[in-house]
């Protein structure tokens, strides 16, 4: 799968879960589970409750995603 196949959404962090995982409510009112991308872990970017984030998702599983940017 190429990078062009990924879908990006904006959402808000609802809940902090273990292992850098978050429950995120997307702008279309879907709630998904998202984990932090490797670059964000490497640079130690903290994500807190209520933060606006950009989530990247694959079209094959629309219940999971990856947080790629914090606004």
UniProtKB/Swiss-Prot annotation:
Recorded GO CC terms: cytosol
A Gene Ontology molecular function term of the record: translation initiation factor activity
Disulphide bond pairs: none
Residue span(s) of domain S1-like: 1-71
Pfam families: eIF-1a
Keywords, in A-Z order: Cytoplasm, Initiation factor, Protein biosynthesis, RNA-binding, rRNA-binding
Entry-linked InterPro entries: NA-bd_OB-fold, RNA-binding_domain_S1_IF1, TIF_IF1
Subcellular localization, as worded in the UniProt entry: Cytoplasm
Location, primary (coarse class): cytoplasm
Similarity annotation: Belongs to the IF-1 family.
Function: One of the essential components for the initiation of protein synthesis. Stabilizes the binding of IF-2 and IF-3 on the 30S subunit to which N-formylmethionyl-tRNA(fMet) subsequently binds. Helps modulate mRNA selection, yielding the 30S pre-initiation complex (PIC). Upon addition of the 50S ribosomal subunit IF-1, IF-2 and IF-3 are released leaving the mature 70S translation initiation complex.
The protein's assembly and partners: Component of the 30S ribosomal translation pre-initiation complex which assembles on the 30S ribosome in the order IF-2 and IF-3, IF-1 and N-formylmethionyl-tRNA(fMet); mRNA recruitment can occur at any time during PIC assembly.
Name under which the protein is recorded: Translation initiation factor IF-1
Lineage, highest ranks first: Bacteria, Pseudomonadati, Pseudomonadota, Alphaproteobacteria, Rickettsiales
């Amino acid at each position: 799968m190429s990078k062009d196949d990924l879908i990006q959404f904006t959402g808000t962090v609802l809940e902090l879960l273990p292992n850098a995982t978050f429950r995120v409510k997307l702008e279309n009112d879907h709630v998904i589970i998202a984990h932090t991308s490797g670059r964000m872990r490497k640079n130690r970017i903290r994500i807190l409750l209520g933060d606006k984030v950009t989530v990247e998702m694959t079209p094959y599983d629309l219940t999971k995603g990856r947080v790629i940017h914090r606004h």
